[in-house]
Amino acid sequence: ALHMSAQTFSTDRRGVLILSHYSCSSAGTVVAKLSGLQKVAYPLQIGNRAIGRVLPVGDEVTHVSVGDLVFSHIHHQSHSLGSQLVCRIPDELDRAAASMLGMALVALTGLQTAQPQLGDTVVITGAGLVGLFAAQLASLSGAYPILIDLVDHRLEVARSCGIQNTINPIREDAKAGVMTLTNSKGAEVVLECTGVPTVATSATEYAGRNGMIVFVGSPRGEYQTDITPFLEKVHLWRSGGNLTLRGAHEWKIPIEDNDFTRHSMERNCNLLVRLILEDRLKIEPLVSRVYDPEDVAQAYRDLSQHKDLVLGAIFNWTNYHQ
């Protein structure tokens, strides 16, 4: 249930107090924590992505001002101190869908890790929020995405965002489908966005020789198997072999721009905002439902039990501003 309490915030020299407008949870990390699939200590504050307005800021803060609309990695609550990334975004994005920027940031890190070339095929396993953004970003990069998921509704959302090639393994052989679409060569890149170990180890089935598998989704749950066939697929010089494995955790890149790295979370946030405003990156079709924070229990039931209908839970905090 929603917990109401008075809280005093103190902004230090670099602190930013944020009045939340909309916050977002996907069906991944938070559900894994609440279900016990990912071990965490309680009590636990949940949620880590939201947009809102800047209230007081510390004396050394220069990148945002009072009244700015910002995205930040903050909890599901009406007021929060900005956490690490606080990125100013245009007022045009003061809407529920923009709270999903954080999921697009995860996907973009995967694309930047893989660095697909113009004309490459990119297989994306998992059509949750991250996978749906990854497929769109792959297409924007000049690659040909193939999106694989067990849920027809998710693939319908993908097609509404312009992703033409989708595969449901329940209805067809996924490997055969990928090979048909790649003239039997396999994909240059596989982005594993589910975090499900069985899906991760089967990702080699979709890769072509010298291909790359990038782990975007965080792995969870126990999985016992003979790992040798997977390692052979990665190691041996044969069709679909000699593969490169790379991790693409969201936090692998710096938060702020600097002179020594090409990518940062700040730069990525600004890039995604630009793509959204240019209507090149679709976000509205990915909104399943916007919840009142009072309905948090229902929201997480929907995320865990109705993945066929709910991609993510967005909470509207605008009725809790005082």
Where are these regions (language model features)?
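NAD(P)H dinucleotide-binding glycine-rich loop of Rossmann-like/cofactor-binding domains
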Residues: 46-48, 63-127, 155
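C-terminal substrate-binding/catalytic core of Rossmann-like NAD(P)-dependent dehydrogenases/reductases
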Residues: 175-179, 227-287
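C-terminal capping/lid region of NAD(P)-dependent oxidoreductase domains
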Residues: 184, 209, 214, 223-224, ...
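Short beta-strand "acidic-cap" motif of Rossmann-like dinucleotide-binding folds
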Residues: 145-149, 215-216, 248
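Glycine-rich cofactor phosphate-binding loops and adjacent beta1-alpha1 units
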Residues: 164-246
